[in-house]
């Protein structure tokens, strides 16, 4: 069997190695347009920033190591320009020599990935306007940074690569401005959760110009102007385009393969295309979203590697299935970690899923053990079935651990209530006896059993302030004096029982505290005394973060003043 693989990064390289493990006698040829294979896309910004010191550390394998260990024929700096499905051949052009030749195949695997989205704007070809997708892109940017010593940079786009580059450039002393049309960074997060990311970026000197549209670029001596549709141009020493990626599928289209959403390659669960003996994997293919069941584009290394393995199994006569992706991701931004899995509120609304949510502010580990850091968790679940839909976490330590637990729970099709039963490891340096994931389950259990009702930050301003409802802030007087919601009366939780006679049982009570715990306790107390009560999800901290983009402070025992 002769297998030709087009593309040698995540999906292609994984498939090549897997095929060899399954079939020692297969002839495997991997053709890669760039000069590198099996490189770490996700590590490229950290090489620019000097966190990864040596270029060699970016490549997990080389053409030589692929041959020595796997006897795989890797051809870099060569581009497949055409596919003949009937003749089962590909046309290849050697980029350095210009030589053109054909290669036959028994099985063909397409792993071309995606290319940076470059809008048709004036000035994008400037030598000071960069994209970042390949090792060559990385080397070009690093040479520029080391040689020109830029003091200012504009990043067009606020996705993963854009934010990682913003962090690395800022850590090098470059003044960074992020410009993008959407009004929030990191699309997988809801806008309220993205507020914490905005605050962290600003805290480290990164300027955000959100809701603004780039109209073009213009060279201005040793700088470049970023032209904005409704604002004055931005002057900078360099520009990075990071507005997203587009599936690289011109080969598939020209060969007559069926295409999916946004021009991606349509495949089945076996990673087979519409043409026999042609498979496709990675950022170029559409997938089924595990939560919604709808077609989606999810450009992440994890799914690409899994798809490569599955395609290899089936090429070698197996029967493996790719059951979909839920888009689990994690990102480091200065001292913050942002992670998500499944769908957010916008996606749930688009899919027509009736959902509810909880917001909590747990600590990374037991607060009495030194070094505990706060995190903000948001968990979505389907109202009727209670199945988990998605989760978002932003904070310090322990974010990755919790998002992976929740991602596993979603994959296992657990209900939100089953989170309460998870037996998770505990020791004071690592967690609490009630892990944050358990706590999310407890909160959902109380909501669904009717023990408590909640309202959300975007409902605060619409609460009645005409005396027809009681608005209570149950934090300490010290906390209340530092800032409070308009119209809320301060009655500390520990004093609430002494003030019950001052409340009218015929009027609803809305309760607020710092993070939602004490207001929950207050509602449980008030409910048992005959009051109709609801508490603010996420509390004053979440409201403030969303409304003013201020980060929550380090955790301390709820109800105690931090001296």
Question: What do these predicted ranges mean?
Answer:
Residues 110-172, 207, 267-269, 491-499:
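Glycine-rich dinucleotide-binding loop and its adjacent helix/turn
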Residues 417-428, 432-469, 477-510, 514-563:
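Rhodanese-like catalytic fold shared by cysteine-dependent sulfurtransferases
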Residues 1-77, 166-189, 328, 401, ...:
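Beta1-alpha1 glycine-rich phosphate/pyrophosphate-binding loop at the start
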